[in-house]
Structure formats: structure tokens, C-alpha cells
């Protein structure tokens, strides 16, 4: 179950011509091109009323002016279209490398809320059953503020920024999501026992916001305890809200519970824009070009996008076909224990759509 939260903004008006929505497509680096191709092929076969405006952004080229220009073009495209679908862009480790293009997109457009859905796929056996929770992560501050400097040789200071305004905004998003999607509780994940000012502010603001939502139970957990609880008893979780870094870590832990990063959908929301991408944000460089990529995360993220645009019937068809192929177990990619290629898996979904 998923209901978008951006439509309540009067500023959000997706671009639509001739009965079709125009959506920005950023294939991404690594396996992004392969998984994006799977989505576009499925959309074409299903006659989904979407026209993609493709912008080829890459983070692979160090300090390349054309990469920066492409990023700017992508931002302008998203400002026009209001909705985007993207793969993950590579971020270099080296000091001289560019900052994360993924983070830059979210900050420039103030796409402040990340949503990752952690849920068992019917018929696909994992260690835990009945896992179904949402991770909501603040996208624009915390440890991802990008404010670092070397004060003296051998000493680096990295600033973690937490503000009351953005803490309140993400908490409201989490409670609104819970309310609109039939969830019962929202848990604040923090480290306020150590970071008493920063995470203390985040936790305190969370409980202030909770006072306005009588139907939802507020809880909180220290992040290390939450990580342990996630792998031991994930069924207790419903909606989790947290600063940026904790969200990155728990999203990856969550993915391992239900099949890995290849099956986790994600979305990012701001007041005016929505950007959909795989929930675990893995580039997959080690398997690029080998035809082994699992496109499920990209496909399910695209289904979230369709629901966001009000195209529920198309989303239901594609979602059902994807789940059906996985449940059948005959055509699975390598990460799910099979030997099918990305193309084989995609074509199995296309065939299943015809029979549904």
C-alpha cells in the first residue's frame, strides 16, 4: 500500500501533454542503464502513458565539465517535469573527486524525504517472514551536509548539521505517511545518548510533532539497538524515521532481510518534486555489462512512480507480473539464486503481463 504525499502541494503539477506524462529519466552509472532499459521496455509493452525525457548523467568521470553540465540539465528537466526516475550515480572516494551528484540533486531541488519500503516478496523464502516496514530518511542535512575541512595536517573536522525546521518537516512527513497508509506507529532512530545536542534536537522535535497525531504511536530507539532489532525481530517495525546516515545503514540492513538491494524500491519527495530510484542506492560496478543485474528494485520504484501519478492500474499490472515471476522461481537473476540474465527476467515479466 502506498499513497503519495506530494500531491497535497498546489505547486506540484506534473507535466502532461496529449494524455501522457513527461518524466525525467536518469539511467545512472553501473547497472543503471541495464535496469532502466528493463523499465522502459516494460512500460512500452504495457502502453504506459509516460514519455521519458532521458538525461545521461554520470559520476564516473572525475572533474569532467560535461558531467557537471549534464547534472545541471537534469536539474532543469526535473524542475520542468516535477517527476523523475533515476538509477544511482557513482560518487568517487578520492579527495579530489566531485561531491555526490545524488546528494546534489536532492539538495538543489529540496527533495528532503527518502522513502524505502522493506517488505517480503510473496513466495520468495528468506530468513524472516512478515517483514513490512518503511524507512523514512532526512535527505538534505545530517552527516551528508558535505561540510568537512582539515584544520591542521592529520586532523579533519566533519560537521553534522541538524536543524529544528528540517527535523520537524521530516517527522511530519513520517506521521503523514503512517496516517495515510494505515500504519500504527512511527519510531525515531537516533543516537541522542551520545550526540545530545544534534540527535537530542531531532528526537525532541519528533515527540513535539507526535503530539498532533493521536492515532499513531510514537516510539524511539538508539540506532545501534535498532540495527540489532532489525536482524533479530524486524516484524516489530512499522515506520522508522531518522537522520541521513542512519537511514543509509538501516536501508541496507533491511534489504538483506528480504532478498538484497536488487529488490528494494525507493522514492524521494519534496514540496514540488518527486524522484524515484532503487532504495539501496547501489551502483553495481562489479557486475556492470554482464547481464546479471536484477531490475526488480528499478521496476518496483517505477511502480511507485505510477501510483504517485495516479496510474494505479498500470502499477498493479507490472507489480503483479514481477512478483509472480519471482514467486514462480523459474526465471530468477543470480542474486536471487537463479541463473537468468537481466533480459531473461524482463522478458518473463512481459510474458506474465500478457496472461494477467
From Swiss-Prot:
Cellular component GO terms held in the UniProt record: cytoplasm; isocitrate dehydrogenase complex (NAD+); mitochondrial matrix; mitochondrion
| Pfam families per UniProt | Iso_dh
Keyword RNA-binding part of the UniProt annotation: yes
Where mainly located? mitochondrion
How is the co-factor bound, per the entry? Binds 1 Mg(2+) or Mn(2+) ion per subunit.
Query: Where along this sequence does the record place binding of Mg(2+)?
Result: 224
* Statement: the UniProt record of this protein carries the keyword Protease: no
- Reactions that this protein is recorded to catalyse: D-threo-isocitrate + NAD(+) = 2-oxoglutarate + CO2 + NADH
Q: Which residues bind substrate?
A: 106, 137, 224
Q: Would you kindly state one Gene Ontology biological process term found in this protein's UniProt entry? A: tricarboxylic acid cycle
User: Per the entry, which co-factors are needed?
Assistant: Mg(2+); Mn(2+)
Q: Which UniProt keywords apply?
A: Magnesium, Manganese, Metal-binding, Mitochondrion, NAD, Oxidoreductase, RNA-binding, Transit peptide, Tricarboxylic acid cycle
Site Critical for catalysis: which residues? Answer: 144, 191
User: What superkingdom does the record give?
Assistant: Eukaryota
Database matches in PROSITE patterns = IDH_IMDH
* Subcellular location field: Mitochondrion
What GO MF annotations does this protein's record show? Answer: isocitrate dehydrogenase (NAD+) activity; magnesium ion binding; NAD binding; RNA binding
Which InterPro entries does the UniProt entry name for this protein?
A: IsoCit/isopropylmalate_DH_CS, Isocitrate_DH_NAD, IsoPropMal-DH-like_dom
- What are its E.C. numbers? 1.1.1.41
Subunit note: Octamer of two non-identical subunits IDH1 and IDH2.
* Family the UniProt entry places it in: Belongs to the isocitrate and isopropylmalate dehydrogenases family.
Q: What's this chain's function?
A: Performs an essential role in the oxidative function of the citric acid cycle. Also binds RNA; specifically to the 5'-untranslated leaders of mitochondrial mRNAs.
What protein is this chain from?
Isocitrate dehydrogenase [NAD] subunit 1, mitochondrial
Q: What is the lineage of its organism?
A: Eukaryota, Fungi, Dikarya, Ascomycota, Taphrinomycotina
